[in-house]
Amino acid sequence: MTSSPKIVAALSGGVDSSVAAALVRKQGYRVCGVTLWLMRGKGSCCSDGMKDAARVCEQLDIPHHIVDIRQQFEETIVDFLVEGYREGITPLPCSRCNKELKFGLLLEYARRKLGIGTVATGHYARTGFDGQTGRHWLARAVDRTKDQSYFLYDLSQEQLASAVFPLGEMTKDQTRTLAAELGLSVAHKPESMDLCLVEAAGSMRNFLNAHIDTRRGEIVDTSGKILGEHDGAHHYTVGQRRGLGVAAPYPLYVVAVDAANNRVVVGAREEATACECTVGQVNWVSMAEPEAPIQAEVQVRYRSQPVQATIIPLPARGARIAFDDAPQFAISPGQAAVWYAGERVLGGGIILASGRS
């Protein structure tokens, strides 16, 4: 008699990961719950999340392991985030956390300690294998309002081969309904709306102030004229309008954060747009790196609408993205540009710079 396959369910203590664990158990897997202990304090990634995850595992009658990676989280995510803001960019910690921790350290723990090579998570995304290309693909979730493929673009082929996304074909409402039907203790738990770091600190401002010394500096326009004073350049990001504290006859937006000179550059909305951008650390997902430029739909922020663009591959895992129809607003260095063909993620990379030429 063949035994049922084993799978690790990554459990944060939230409704999504809990339902994902219940679904793979229902599909016949022998499930082992694993929760990553990321930081001290209360919240979804701290003690509250671990307690809720433990209760769910008890309800599902599956074993539960807690893996203490607080030091690795500090080094891999916190330091990365702080250094990025010091440099005047807007880092994307969630994609890094997915690659390095959830499908990095967690998968390594599953293989080494549990002898399990597959991980199910509560991400809203889809994946599979294309026999024609010989590649594992990544695609948007059915629920476009909750789709998280943007944050998963950097997963390697090996990581995608080990990933299971049980919620990819479901809507958030269906997930909530199923959690209630199963009687899960987290069925009505409120959804976390912030980064786990922000949740623990109370706000992004609090988090940054705890890690970066505040230095006042100048707010200038694109010609260098001084318009006002800021309370720390790390509190500003490209495209920001609120909180500038500068009077002008037209709305002002952050055009650039000049960390080297401790300046925040502002201008009219059109001055915060770009016709192209360059990206680095490119990861090609559902297709191999092409030899020639390709057409694709590009998303330059998590909530931005995809726009038609030309992707020109560059050496050293780089690419240039030229927007075909119109300049794009608020292209922030440090964020990801992810390109799609329909629902499938073709690739993505970290935005390095943008231009209007």
From Swiss-Prot:
Provenance organism: Gloeobacter violaceus (strain ATCC 29082 / PCC 7421)
Localization annotation: Cytoplasm
Annotated disulfide bonds: 97-196
Record's protein name: tRNA-specific 2-thiouridylase MnmA
Gene that encodes it: mnmA
Role this protein plays: Catalyzes the 2-thiolation of uridine at the wobble position (U34) of tRNA, leading to the formation of s(2)U34.
Catalysed reactions listed for this entry: S-sulfanyl-L-cysteinyl-[protein] + uridine(34) in tRNA + AH2 + ATP = 2-thiouridine(34) in tRNA + L-cysteinyl-[protein] + A + AMP + diphosphate + H(+)
Keywords of this entry: ATP-binding, Cytoplasm, Disulfide bond, Nucleotide-binding, RNA-binding, Transferase, tRNA processing, tRNA-binding
A GO molecular-function descriptor: tRNA binding
InterPro entries named among the record's database cross-references: MnmA-like, MnmA-like_C, MnmA-like_central, MnmA-like_central_sf, Rossmann-like_a/b/a_fold
